């Protein structure tokens, strides 16, 4: 017992002794070496001890990784050769690395790998071959890697994968195939990956998602298909993925989606569909998704939305349907069921009008963006009962007027953007102008709302207009005036209308008559002038006489 204890202690002390570190390397930790520079073909000449467990090589010169580079390193567990110029790996290079758990050959120039290169690494758990120039992979390359959990083949030039390539990788949890030239995935390619959690296939050239391709991936939580050329998705493609929480389908060529495509995706918390040429959405698309908080449908070809299209997304907080010029109308209940929605982005579309109850039931809405549309008017009750609303963006539309109480009963409102509209500063704007003058702090000063007309008021900020005018005509227009023979009446051209300090007075009709006798008027006018002159002379004469008399009295009193 004592002999065994002493033997273990001696072996431990021997192992704890630092090994001689090669001159071109750094050995900060025991059993670990970090080397940079030098020639790839002369790694064996570095004199690395065979009892190392970690080796990091980077910045190596161009060359072929030789078979004797790691001879005798039977206890090595982590080998990382990255950011170098390795063009190829000789057969048998890793034959002695029987305990290796991590192999990283990232960011090199490797174009091909020998078929049996990895056969001795049965304990390998992580394999990173990303950022190389691989054009193809032998179908038997990974057959012995039964313990592999992470495989990165991203950022290569792969355009084809053998159907049996991953057959024995039953413990795989991460598979990254992004950034390649793949156009399709063969049937059965992912049939053995029941434990796979993350599948990254974005930035390829895939044209379709075929039926059954993903059926074996019951543990999958993240699926990335964005930046492909996908035109079609098989109905029920995601039905067998009960744990899926993140799905990206943005930046593809999808013109339509199968009905009920996401009906069984109850655990989704992230779904992207933006930048697809979607022409319409099916009436039933989403199932109950209690965890989905964001949905973006930007840059599509949608013309409208189905009524209650999002009714099952009860926990949605952010919804964006933007940058879709063909979107010109929305149904009454487009956002029904979104009681938790906080941000609604509808900017940069082609909306010309909005239904009265579009925002009904969105009691927690804080921000709504309707900027850069073609809106000419808003319903009076559009923002009614939105007590949490803080920001409303209506700039860059074609608004001419708004109801005076359109923003009434919004206690938390802090911002209203109204610039770059076609404000018609006539009498009809009066009620809204009254509200605006009481809430100038809410309107952005960088792009203030300005009058588009009429006349001299064009270009003036709304709040710079003068106050109320008693002559502003009522809703039914100005009172009728007695007119001469109707045949002699002719309306004055708007350019000849009288100027006024108020923006709406110009709209009052002005008429002229032909052959009217104004001589009585002028006679009376001159008579008044004559009378006024006579009265003025009499007053001046009387004041002079009074002044003289006053001075005479003063002198007499002074002498007496």
UniProtKB/Swiss-Prot annotation:
LRR-type repeats, residues: 75-96, 99-120, 123-144, 147-168, 171-193, 195-216, 219-240, 243-264, 267-288, 291-312, 340-361, 364-385, 388-409
Ranges in the topological domain labelled Extracellular: 17-523
Task: Describe the location of the LRRCT domain by residue ranges.
Answer: 421-474
Residue span of region Disordered: 469-498
**What are the glycosylated positions?**
51, 181, 243, 267, 298, 312, 385, 499
Q: Which residues cross the membrane?
A: 524-544
Stretches assigned to the LRRNT domain: 17-50
Subcellular location, in the record's words?
A: Membrane
**Its membrane topology, per UniProt?**
Single-pass type I membrane protein
> Does this entry carry the keyword Transmembrane?
yes
> Any signal peptide, and if so, which residues?
1-16
- Post-translational modification, as annotated: The N-terminus is blocked.
Q: What cellular component terms from Gene Ontology apply here?
A: extracellular exosome; glycoprotein Ib-IX-V complex; plasma membrane
Pfam families in alphabetical order:
LRR_8, LRRCT
Provide Cytoplasmic-side residue ranges.
545-560
Q: Which keywords does this chain's UniProt record carry? A: Blood coagulation, Cell adhesion, Glycoprotein, Hemostasis, Leucine-rich repeat, Membrane, Repeat, Signal, Transmembrane, Transmembrane helix
The record's tissue-specificity note reads: Platelets and megakaryocytes.
User: Where does this chain mainly localize?
Assistant: membrane
**Any GO BP annotation:** blood coagulation, intrinsic pathway
This chain's function reads:
The GPIb-V-IX complex functions as the vWF receptor and mediates vWF-dependent platelet adhesion to blood vessels. The adhesion of platelets to injured vascular surfaces in the arterial circulation is a critical initiating event in hemostasis.
Q: What is this protein called?
A: Platelet glycoprotein V
**Source organism (scientific name):** Homo sapiens (Human)
